[in-house]
Amino acid sequence: MIIGFVGFGEAAAAIAEGLHEEGAEDLICFDAMQNDLRFTEKLAAKRAKANAARKETSAEVCREADVVISAVPSGFALSAAKEAVPGLTAGTIYVDVSTATPAEKKRIAVLVEEKGGRFVDGAMMGTLLKDRHQVPTLCCGSGATEYLEKMAPYHMRLT
């Protein structure tokens, strides 16, 4: 299973690192700042620590991944989805773990589901940098049950 990340800042990198340690082998990611010289080294180090392959666009992540975790600042969640979702293939699970508003999450869900994907709103309820991939996360949406099943081998704390 390929797990992709849209956004690879502190949250995504922490989750990816934990997943890698649990045995996830196929991790891919895109970050909008990856070509900004101020961030290239830091992002490269995070990718290396999680053994995550860099992709050139978020749409490429959606095209290749079975599960996509979008971990961008809340103000960018909808615009990130609009850029990523055109690459989505039917059956892909798109998980938004941002703190975007309910109205924005609904818009993202519509975008995902119109492409044949399944949406998950993931509300992280703990200390992410400490708990990493095991941060307690409340999940809802059309893809929630399947997301819990797919991620079970990685000992995430999803409900």
Question: What is each of the regions a protein language model found here?
Answer:
Residues D26, A53-R54, I93, R118, ...:
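Conserved beta-strand segments of alpha/beta enzyme cores
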Residues A59-F119:
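Rossmann-fold NAD(P) dinucleotide-binding segment
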Residues L43-A44, A71, Q134-T137:
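Short low-complexity, flexible loop/linker segments enriched in glycine and/or proline
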Residues A100, K106-T159:
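Rossmann-fold dinucleotide-binding core
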Residues C29, Y94-D96, T137:
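Structural beta-sheet core signal
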Residues M1-R63:
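NAD(P)+-binding Rossmann beta1-loop-alpha1 motif at the extreme N-terminus of oxidoreductases
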